[in-house]
Amino acid sequence: MLKGLTSKADARLKPALPGFTNVYRYWDARFAKVAVKLQPGECYVTKNDEMLVTVLGSCIAACIRDPVAGVGGMNHFMLPEQAAGHEITRNSLSNPELCYGNWAMEHLINSIIKCGGMRNRLEIKLFGGGRVLANMVRMDIGQRNIEFVESFLANDELPVIAKDLGGNYPRKILYFAATGQAKMKKMGIASDTNLVKQEKAYLDSLATKPSAGDVELF
């Protein structure tokens, strides 16, 4: 039984698709749905009526679905591209490759297509890329992530139907894969000290490792 699930809710729970069983799921009483919590470097695709949840600073989350095939998902990446010699190796990350936008975007889109989706039907929403630390003026990871994801989708001729990118605030995102509805909450930086620590770790990692539709506020 997933954390927080009642026996009644557990009886309605459908299994996660193969390849996505390790992502943390729990019962959200407010929305009366199974929720899926994505951390940096994670991706989740589903055919179920689930709510995908993540918190973003400079990271980007792409929310993508095919409304005809009834499949959708979300990724959460930290940096634009993995070049030779660049690597994120912190043990807390479930898949270091998916911390990079070039891997994360391909993985999400290809996983949706494998589940019956088609590229010409994809609905795409983008969030994140904020500047949440003062010293990011010198190394604005969020802006680099924005430039990457917009260029990636433009090169593949995949239109974005809604986005909320940039700014100087973190975001909490709720994405309802079955309907494509997205809810976004702007957060104060002080409200999530773990996020601030995470952002500082991004900068430290870069400094010490060698090179290599509509949005509803709630």
Swiss-Prot record:
Superkingdom, taxonomy of origin: Bacteria
TM stretches of this protein: none
EC main group: hydrolase
Catalytic activity, EC: 3.5.1.44
Molecular function via GO: protein-glutamine glutaminase activity
Pfam families linked to this entry: CheD
Hydrolase is among the record's keywords: yes
GO terms (BP aspect): chemotaxis
Keywords from the named record: Chemotaxis, Hydrolase
Keyword Cell inner membrane: no
Record field: catalytic activity: L-glutaminyl-[protein] + H2O = L-glutamyl-[protein] + NH4(+)
InterPro entries listed in its UniProt record: CheD-like_sf (IPR038592), Chemorcpt_Glu_NH3ase_CheD (IPR005659), Cytotoxic_necrot_fac-like_cat (IPR011324)
Family matches, as Gene3D superfamilies: 3.30.1330.200
NCBIfam families per UniProt: PRK13487.1
Cited function: Probably deamidates glutamine residues to glutamate on methyl-accepting chemotaxis receptors (MCPs), playing an important role in chemotaxis.
Family membership: Belongs to the CheD family.
Name of this protein: Probable chemoreceptor glutamine deamidase CheD
Gene name of this polypeptide: cheD
